[in-house]
Every structure is written in structure tokens, then in C-alpha cells.
Amino acid sequence: MVAAKKQKKTIESINSRLALVMKSGKYCLGYKQTLKTLRQGKAKLVIIAKNAPPLRKSEIEYYALLAKTGVHHYSGNNIELGTACGKYYRVCTLAITDPGDSDIITTLPESQV
């Protein structure tokens, strides 16, 4: 019970930080744009939904490793990630190039590669 509350709280804090990035920062949504941003070396953090296809997930992780970029595995599916981003469509991957006013890059524990 306690672990479920803590997990819900961390999801809400990640969602609030994502909303702040959407308002004040720069980002790329989608698989192709994320790969393009990683190849250019502009991405600071990559967020992948839980139900992303394994091949795409491993490919993004590989490019992030080469670019020395942090990867966070979002605990919700792509519909929940899209909702957290304030979009009405599904978002499987998301690359943050400029966090803006948000401290999402420094606060995510799994983001260090």
C-alpha cells in the first residue's frame, strides 16, 4: 500500500514536470524525431513509454548511449504519456532538448547513463 502511494506520487511529480517542459521548454515527440535529435546530439533526456516496441526501445537506448543522453522509462503506457504531455494522441517516445523552467533532467533518478 505504501509503495503504491509513493509510486503514484512520483508519477504525478513526473507528470507535473512534463507539463512544465511542454509550456516553457523545447522537445520532440515521436520515434523518428527522437532519433533525429539523438543523432544530432541535441537531446538532454529521452522518455520512453512502458509499452514501446522492444526493437524501438533498444534502438533509442543505443543512440542515447552513444550520445551520452539520459533515458527514463515512463511507468505508464503511450496513451498516459501523451496525456501527461497535454496531447490528445499517443506518444511513445519524447526527447527533451531544453527543459525550460522545469528541473526534470536533474530530478529523475533513472536518467543517468
UniProtKB/Swiss-Prot annotation:
Coiled coil: none annotated. GO terms for cellular component: cytosolic large ribosomal subunit. GO terms for molecular function: RNA binding; structural constituent of ribosome. Keywords: Ribonucleoprotein, Ribosomal protein. Transmembrane segments: none annotated. InterPro entries: Ribosomal_eL30 (IPR000231), Ribosomal_eL30-like (IPR039109), Ribosomal_eL30-like_sf (IPR029064), Ribosomal_eL30_CS (IPR022991), Ribosomal_eL8/eL30/eS12/Gad45 (IPR004038). The keyword Ribonucleoprotein applies. HAMAP family: Ribosomal_eL30. NCBIfam families: PRK01018.1. Belongs to the eukaryotic ribosomal protein eL30 family. This is Large ribosomal subunit protein eL30. It comes from Spodoptera frugiperda (Fall armyworm).
